[in-house]
Amino acid sequence: MTRITLLDTTVRDGNQSNWGATGLDTAMMLGIAPAMDRAGFEAIDFTTSTHMAVAVRYSKQDPWERLRLFRAAAPKTKLSFLTTGMRFISWETASHELMAFAFRLLVNNGIDRFA
């Protein structure tokens, strides 16, 4: 029998439906993290570089702290970073070195899946 897995997009993309481009803040995410961890998702599509920039610009929150806190609150479920090519928190193309550094930081702070 074929195995079916589910990837949840609530905190990365789905939240924009109700809260506009600024999305959920860290406290809102942490409030649902334990339930999401128990739900049995293959992964939670957690963030993008744009999502991280929005956390800083509009919510005045640290996206790295958000990632670490969510990881601690949902330790069993993989967290995904949706990459948009060769850019990170900018519309400008980033160097390979910067992207490698950004990906290392993401892994070190709790991301374990890239899409």
PLM regions with names:
Residues 1-19, 67-72:
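N-terminal amphipathic alpha-helix/helix-capping segment at the start of soluble metabolic enzymes
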Residues 10-31, 82-99, 108, 113:
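Active-site mouth loops of central-metabolism enzymes
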Residues 60-64, 96-101:
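Charged helix-capping and loop-helix junction motifs
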Residues 28-50, 105-111:
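Catalytic domains of carbohydrate-active enzymes, especially glycoside hydrolases
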Residues 37-38, 67-76, 103-108:
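Acidic (Asp/Glu)-rich catalytic clusters
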